[in-house]
Each structure stands twice: as structure tokens, then as C-alpha cells.
Amino acid sequence: MHSKIQTTLAVHALRALLGLALCALAVAALLVFSVVSHAAESFDDQSFKQAQAAGKTILVDVTASWCPTCRQQRPIVEQIEKEKPNLVVYEVDFDTAKDTLKRFRVQHQSTLIVFKGTKEVGRSTGDTDPARIRALVAQGF
């Protein structure tokens, strides 16, 4: 009888452990897919200069986690990234990248800056209209 109780407890413990493992796996999958769907790189000066030297079209996306306008811009920028594989997108965190903000003369989050190589060709702040954001990015192509 004692052995049967131990076996039953072991089975319940294994089921609970399996349930926890499946939950952890589901959370990990969600995190991976959210990272994969969002291809923008965090701003890196060396990488930015290399992209400029190569004459690439670059979008600098100044964003903040607390910014509702930035959250509205995010899916638009992600869609443009998918449509334009030659576009290089860098995210600049408004709250932590103060030197980068000074360099680009940015005073507000939700600022989008487009470069063609070393030349800035367009800039907008606070725009959430997909057509206008697409037109802004198109200036770099």
C-alpha cells in the first residue's frame, strides 16, 4: 500500500513537472518569435558607419518602451523591413542613448531618420501614418 501511494505521488509530480516544462517551452517560443519578427538592431556606431560607407539605406528609429506613438510606429516599421530587405534599421533607445541622440540632434522619442549612405535624406517625429512613413523611407532608395 505504501508503495502504491509513492508511485501515485511520483506520477503526479512528473505530470506537474511536465506541465511546467511545456509552459516554459511555450514562453521561450513566444520570445523567439517576437525577436525574429523584429529585426531592427540596437544602434552600434561601428555597424552604422559600415552601413553608411557601403551606401546603404538606413532607418534610425528613436524609440522608448513607454511611448504610445512608438508602439504605433513599430508594426509599420516592421512591415517596411520585411518589404525592403536592403533597408538597415537601427533602434536607438531614447532613455539610455543620450550621446547618440545628441549626435543625431534628436529631442523627442518616435523620431525616424533616413540616411542614404552618409547623407540624411529624411526625418519625421511622431508620425504614425503608414503612407507617410513609407514615403519617408522611400527617400533613401
Which residue ranges define each predicted feature?
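N-terminal targeting signals for export/organelle localization
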Residues: M1-A40
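A short beta-strand-turn-helix
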Residues: A40-T57, K98
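Short pre-active-site segment immediately N-terminal to redox-active cysteine/selenocysteine motifs
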Residues: G55-I58, V62-W66, H108
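Typically the conserved alpha-helix immediately C-terminal to a functionally engaged Cys/Sec
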Residues: R71-E83
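Thiol-based oxidoreductase modules, predominantly thioredoxin-like and allied folds used
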Residues: P85-K98
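Structural micro-motif
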Residues: F104-I113
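Non-catalytic, surface beta->alpha helical segment in thiol-disulfide oxidoreductase systems
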Residues: K116-F141
